[in-house]
């Protein structure tokens, strides 16, 4: 090799090293920028679970304000309307009017994945001192997951279309999700849902540890197996450890099960240890924000891998549609 050739080789090697370093740094920055920050998650929960929201009880101005806040977040993420010209879909229950919230992101396929959580809680009590049931875990944490997923996929091209829903009046009998599921104007949306992820109480560490959730009704479909097969960064969906409590039939997912849509609830709550369920200490201080943020980002990256070929969950013959 001549001296000139040697210099040329050295220069090319140096340039390639610098180029590779540049690409690595930029790809790392881009990847990091796609993630939902802990500050963002805390902000969403703090807004919904603030004292000003007075427990978000159905039929109150604060409940309406919560729905409007979620709708504004859907708008920021450029979601389309599920029906009509608003994210807010009204319904009535015993003479009181409320709103569910629904937005849609179009993908390459008409088939969709749906993500949901309920935003209402149980209001206040008449006792002295702290009398507000803030509902940070139940279920502002689930709403933060739905909004976080909308954030993550805002500028991404996905195979599946995506439906984002926030249900009202869960605490008084799953009323809001039933009203939405029974709304015939939404049949064109619901008829294309391949699977629904209903997020319910994710603010605390599960009995399985960090970065781990459990899924209700795992015995009825292969939903969890398919998620675990595609899971990233150690995310793990465990079987329901509380099957005797029939949680599958006691959360908003059930109103979509009735429509024979694959619909499961996902949670981290340790029901053997939790002392904040429907208690005034269910506030921002109960939230393990780092773990929740990690779960949201890992679900987002896992869902990003899903398409109409590698994720088509099905019910087995154990599920009961008539109840």
What spans do the regions from the language model cover?
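Bacterial Sec-dependent N-terminal signal peptides
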Residues: 1-36
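N-terminal capping segment at the start of a domain
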Residues: 36-65, 77, 273-279
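Second-shell loop/turn segments in exported
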Residues: 51-61, 89-90, 128-139, 166-167, ...
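A non-catalytic alpha/beta surface segment that caps or lines the substrate-entry region
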Residues: 56-106
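His/Asp/Glu-rich mid-to-C-terminal helical/loop segments that flank catalytic regions of hydrolases
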Residues: 59, 273-323
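Alpha-helical metal-binding/catalytic segments enriched in His/Glu/Asp
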Residues: 103, 115, 121, 126-173, ...
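Metal-dependent peptidase/peptidase-like ectodomains
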Residues: 167-265
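Zn-dependent metallopeptidase/amidohydrolase metal-coordination segment
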Residues: 245-292
